[in-house]
Amino acid sequence: MEGALGERLKREYGLAFDEHLAMARLIYQPEGAAALRELWGGYIDIARRYALPFMATTPTRRANRERLAAANSTGQVIADNVAFLREIQKNSGIEMYVGGLMGCRGDAYTGEGALPEDEALEFHRWTAEQFRCAGADFLYAGIMPTLPEAAGLARAVDETGMAYIISFTIQADGKLIDGATISDAVEYIDSITDNKPLCYMTNCVHPSIAAKALGQEFNRTACVWKRFCGIQANTSPLSYAELDGAEDLHCSEPEEFAEEMMKLGEFPNVRIWGGCCGTDHRHMEHIAKKIRGRHGEKQLQL
């Protein structure tokens, strides 16, 4: 999966994000579009060198109906972001999947402003339908901090019939921000959907924290081991509270980071490896090298 976009766009390219839509409007700016092409191009080159399938997601986590209205925009922003990434896919020459990124209504790190399940269904239904109409290959619900909102979003995507992944905001204690265990969250969402998520993941968290979370006794269940399949990881072992608003990134060295990622191989179905805050092409290259070293010349599939 792709590595960091947002932090790199700010720190390496000096780009400012929209107050309502964050990165979703960058495709309309020459500098923003060029930076996105360059970052994705670098990640694609790594996937090509190591013969790995590649997943990328539109920078649209904040592009929900409420925020689009506040920005005086429409769902065309979603369609244009999917089309932009689709063009990159067509020119990539690799096995690549275009994901539509969705997110929670409120704060992904604290859970503040999170929606109850039925309200979440109504809130996310429109966004999911926009991605269906735009033709994304799958939907990716990133850093979901609470079970009720994640469940409501899953129900909304369930209605579209699209493939999708739910990625939780998790802590070392093995729970989401609202206190739901990973196991309970997976079991509950699977129980209320006909078109179940392809799998579950976590993102914006260090692999050592994810390992502690998954290793909690109440998460060492058949459903977690079968259904939890990936991580899009931070390079810093700091907690969400410590990371949020940090002036400086706390970055692990690429090789050390890749070693920490591979320790998640204890969990048998973890097969989606991506980067979040602090990662760049060096980190993703070391991860790809580790994956290829582990599997030899075997053709890998998602």
Where do the protein language model's features map onto the residues?
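Domain-level signal for soluble alpha/beta catalytic cores
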Residues: M1-L302
